Amino acid sequence: MLQPLIQDRDRLEQVLRQLPLAPGVYFLKDKTDQILYIGKSKRLRSRVRSYFREPAQLGPRLERMVYQVAEIEFIVTDTEAEALALEANLIKQHQPHFNVLLKDDKKYPYVCITWSEPYPRIFITRKRQFGNGGDPRSDSAKDRYYGPYVDSFRLRQTLALVKRLFPLRQRPRPLFRDRPCLNYDIGRCPGVCQGLISPQEYRQTLQRVAMIFQGRTGELVAQLQAQMAQAAADLNFELAARLRDQIRGLEHLGVDQKVSLPDDTVSRDAIALAVGDRHAAIQLFQIRAGRLVGRLAFVADAQSGSAGTILQRVLEEHYAQVEDVEIPSEILLQHPLPEPDFLRTYLSEKKGRAVTLTVPQRQAKAELIAMVQRNAELELARLQQASDRTQTALEDLAQLLGLDTLPHRIEGYDISHIQGSDAVASRVVFIDGLPAQQHYRHYNIRNPEVKLGHSDDFASLAEILRRRFAPYLEGQGETPDDWPDIILIDGGKGQLSAVVQVLEPLLEELTLVSLAKQREDIFLPHQRQPLPADPEQPGVQLLRRVRDEAHRFALNFHRQKRAQRQRRSHLDQIPGLGYQRQKELLATFRSIDYIRMATPEQLAQVNGVGPRLAARIYRYFHPDAD
């Protein structure tokens, strides 16, 4: 296994000499061949060498990365712009740890349009997905996200208005097999489920909707006005009236904008940031036709570099995701960028027209940047307040449990069942005091003794913790990156004792606690009395949040499993209706009640269900029918 390059200067120099003085993308990898960082440069050798000259001057985050680099690879490109575009795609695909400059703050919503589907949907989400692991060649990589937006209330108002003005797909699955639902009858949906509109025609409608979230509402209104005039000339007054209503609704979107510029031809973005001890809050204002049409917000690691470096990285990540028509002619900057020519060339080539980058010094442009900065400072204050509360809770918890360092990873476990039936367990994970949902996990209880009428939370918890730590209990694994500092069990001394019997060999390496309900007592292994603690102190409140989240996650999975069993228990009693056909029925009708309401003809249209089986299903739910 290769050792870090910084510990082998001869090999480091040999690797650096192999890098060309040309534009391209470089990969920094650790000793396990994992990609730590992907970067781009117009001179690969010079850029990569700069990491190893004085690592301490790079900041704590990048210094930690440099001491892990064991291998360097690269791809040469013809131009700097090609390098930036390739870097953006590779970062999406691999998501390297040290490239995650922009933090995933669920506070900010996006609008998603699923262009990967024949009839795309449009909806609001707080989680941005990169399809197929971020592979830009995958179908789901075609989906488009607009945002993240600051004002979620206004965003929901805008989308609600859009859905009233334009007939759009309303449901992820059809409600009926042979007819459209009520949304079609009231003009909210064009009958997507029954193919009453072609995919091409429907996409034309959605492309108009996309223009709204691209900040091109004025351009869309002009198009609709021309189409309305043509419809009136063709005596198609119904279409002309519909277009008129759409125009009026779109004009209403911009009526209450508080920011407007005297030049109604202006198309520019303005970006500024505020940097604190841990976070950097970035705001980007989108000005189109002299009006503020969008406020985007980003959160970055304050240790990512200088203010200019953070701004450059945010702009690169943002504009790599947008379409060429969304790039403005001018971008106003709060601070100079370290590589402005790189970004300017990339944006100009992508837009097909010159894009200017300016740090304004006076008059209206400087006032606009000052306003963006004030908004960034307000957002930073919110972030700092939330971060301070979390830090206080971690410090209090470390003191309460006698830990030498602040707990980084806390795992919470809980069991859910009804008298032993459909028994499941959950694991939730908090990283640095915040939920890390990518590490959550469900468990099915495998113990055959746990069944209806015979519940055993002690045995269930012991089983789950044994499965979680099996490799380490058997001495087959080294301490991994996902090793928890604290394991929290929902329960009292009994639940804790059951888990202690399993994890006894590991108790010197981790802290095991249980949190009982009602009095919120905290128990430690081999101690009869609970820890003296105030239920309202910050550390205990953090444990309560972990415990409650584990309970919620387990309960939701239990309800899902129970509902699935109850649905299938009905269908299992119908002769000839196997597992696959049951899945088709439930996918089509979504519930037993809708299956019960369906006619034999509707049932027969389900894939794999012919007229004879449909009649049998119908008779099962309607035994008195002829």
UniProtKB/Swiss-Prot annotation:
Tell whether Cytoplasm is among the UniProt keywords.
yes
Q: One GO biological process from the UniProt record?
A: nucleotide-excision repair
The record's annotation in Gene3D superfamilies points to: 5' to 3' exonuclease, C-terminal subdomain, GIY-YIG endonuclease, UVR domain, UvrC, RNAse H endonuclease domain
In terms of PROSITE patterns, this protein maps to: GIY_YIG, UVR, UVRC
Residues in domain GIY-YIG? 21-100
* UniProt key word Transferase: no
Instruction: State where the protein is found.
Output: Cytoplasm
**Per its database record, what is this protein's job?**
The UvrABC repair system catalyzes the recognition and processing of DNA lesions. UvrC both incises the 5' and 3' sides of the lesion. The N-terminal half is responsible for the 3' incision and the C-terminal half is responsible for the 5' incision.
- Summarize the subunit comment: Interacts with UvrB in an incision complex.
Q: Which family does it belong to?
A: Belongs to the UvrC family.
Name the chain's protein. UvrABC system protein C
* Species name: Thermosynechococcus vestitus (strain NIES-2133 / IAM M-273 / BP-1)
